[in-house]
Amino acid sequence: MGHRKLASPRRGSAGLRPRKRSSELLPTPRTWPQINSQNPKLLGFVGYKVGMTHVFMIDDWPNSPTNGKEIYMPVTVLEVPPIIPLALRAYAIDGKGEPNVITEYWSSSSLQFLDITRRIHSISSFLKDDESKKKFDERFNTKLDLIKSNLDRIVYFRLLVSTQPRKIPSLGKKAPDLVEIQIGGGEKKSQLDYALNILGKEITIRDVFKEGQLIDVVGVTKGKGFAGVIKRYSVVELPRWHKHRKGSRKIGTRGPSLGTPSYTPQPGQLGFHRRTEYNKRIIKIGDEPKEINPAGGFVRYGIVRNTYVLLEGSILGSKKRPIFLREPVRPSYVFENPPKITYVNLLSQQG
């Protein structure tokens, strides 16, 4: 009976299963960090991927062999217009021992952002006149009283925020993306006051992050469609000789006759997976698009017109895709100052 004479590690990571399409284009993080801050703040932000370029900067890693020298650094550009908090959601432990929403509070100031009706159609009924807005406030004031009376039960607050894609003509869409962002730092009372104060107001990325710090990136990877085991799991192709009449770009066997084990590589969906990348450094936050726009604009995107962010290295996702930026859950290093950039490539990317 034939058998393998050489050993090799199994192909494919079990930590990335199931390899299926993401259920949402802008996923909410499943984990949030605990920050040491007396003042409450949002723990995340949303941006749109533009493309990549490169810069030259002074290396400021303490133990790096090139510390203090000029180095080449590829960077990813994200366009980050302000976000708008729409509603406050309070989470408490339910009967099953899991955190769950006990209620949510909406303010009439949130209704000034009219594009929200493209996502939540029922809100349009409260935009008819002042009397409708008054009834809207009366309806949710009782829920605000419920939050204040159960402040000791609440484990954390989250804000339902909306992006403003209308400010980015390159996206070609008006419907905003909605996502929950948790509030961290301070006491529960100060977090509640902070949330009520910023409802309906624009929040910029400088209110959440600063230059030079590390962040986590959560998003959906590029979709590749249906792929075979060679590309999907990096399985070694079988040798091509005259007795291999059943193909080479496949596995030798799927297992015993009783069934196929779950860990056996098989063809299927590749890409469009929800993934998280840790500790991406913010190289720069800029308000002048001309400092980053190359000649002719970014290929398959166009021209940056709002506040932008430069992230060290590459990140997941295709161009124009929403990307969630989160405070790092396990930062590898804390930088005190942003790096010094000496050159930004603005040459045309169109060849």
UniProtKB/Swiss-Prot annotation:
Disulfide bonds: none annotated. It comes from the Archaea. Signal peptide: none annotated. Residues 1-31, 246-271 are annotated as: Disordered. Keywords: Ribonucleoprotein, Ribosomal protein, RNA-binding, rRNA-binding. GO terms for biological process: translation. It holds the Pfam family Ribosomal_L3. GO terms for molecular function: RNA binding; rRNA binding; structural constituent of ribosome. One of its GO terms (cellular component) is cytosolic large ribosomal subunit. Belongs to the universal ribosomal protein uL3 family. One of the primary rRNA binding proteins, it binds directly near the 3'-end of the 23S rRNA, where it nucleates assembly of the 50S subunit. Part of the 50S ribosomal subunit. Forms a cluster with proteins L14 and L24e. This is Large ribosomal subunit protein uL3.
